Amino acid sequence: VPATAAGTAYYVSADGSDANDGTSPQSAWQTLDMVNAAALQPGDSVSFRRGDVFSGGLMVNRSGTSRLRITLNSYGSGDLPVVTGGLTGTCVRLDGDFIAIDGLQAESCGYAGFSVYGDYGSVRNSAARNNAAGIKVSDGSDFGTYANNTLADNNIMNVNTPGSECGTATAVQCNDDSGAFGFLINGSDNEFSGNTITGSTALSYDFGHDGSAIEIFNGNRNSIHHNVAVDNNVFSELGRGGGGTADGNTYSYNLIRSTCGAGCSQAMGLIARGRTSSFGPTNGTTFEHNTVWLDGPDSQAVVCHASCPASTVVRANILVAVRNSLWMDSAGWTEEQNVLNGPTNIVPSATSTTDPAGFVDAPADLHLSG
């Protein structure tokens, strides 16, 4: 088996054969079974031929190291190689630490396109579509990097049940719907940058519409910056439960726009919560230098409710929405240097303004003209 100081390179193509050794494009494997069975070592790579479609699930349960990651990538020219079908609802599952994905697509997987369970994972330059969750960063999956991915039309509801006796003390299944996630984040200390997330919106019995570009539940200190989110039901919703926390998450320099008609009628930018919510509190949330432009009749750019934590910071954003540009209850939080175009329930700080933002050509071009 040819090897270098960095490890062994393996190849997979639709024209390969599982009788091959997989160590060159000319002797590529054909199926994911060979990759799943391989005893991958730190520094090893598996390259999938562009333009090919691989059915089933891909699972890596070995770990790389900080110096020598295990890498899954692509070779050749054309469209990203696609993994579809999935095993137990996931197309690509990373159980080990220090595993990097660069240039794969996970499509129609049932539940998640990519599920990351280990630490120091990386998913870059990849794509996911037609899943309940494009990329799931699972509980205990920390210190990962997720950059320059395209997550489109991950609009499948994982749970969508009609409730009964809603609004009464005997309510059942009235707020359990979930799904249509671009990213679903249950881990901590991860970085998400340069991603484009579109079309995470779906009909919901409980909420009318549901879905989120970046959902954080029991995840802490994640950094979400320089992403583009278009035509999603919500940009990001924060929540906690079962003894977990969702504290210290930061959002900066993100572009958020929802103008897709009925599917965006209830669109929201950020949802944070206080201690009187069953999913709160979400402490220490910082939302700064973001642009939010929503035109749905019930749209709200930023909402921090249920006794909004005093540790919440909303700073230097442009917030445009029809129902509320900014809604915050309780007191003690920081609101400053914002442009608020749309109703608000607070008295803006002296450093904020309600003057029109002055875009070049909203919503098509949300650069400022000044």
Predicted segments with their positions:
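Right-handed parallel beta-helix/beta-solenoid
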Residues: 1-33, 50-52, 75-76, 356-362
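Loop/turn elements at helix/coil->beta-strand transitions in domains of secreted/extracellular proteins
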Residues: 6-9, 41-45, 68, 79, ...
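Right-handed parallel beta-helix/beta-spiral solenoid domain characteristic of secreted/periplasmic
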Residues: 14, 29, 45-56, 61-112, ...
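Feature marks extracellular polysaccharide-active and adherence modules
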Residues: 49, 61, 73-75, 94-95, ...
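Predominantly extracellular beta-rich ligand-binding scaffolds that present long acidic/polar faces
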Residues: 56, 61, 223-229, 248-369
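Solenoid scaffold repeats with emphasis on beta-solenoid/beta-helix
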Residues: 58, 70, 81, 90-92, ...
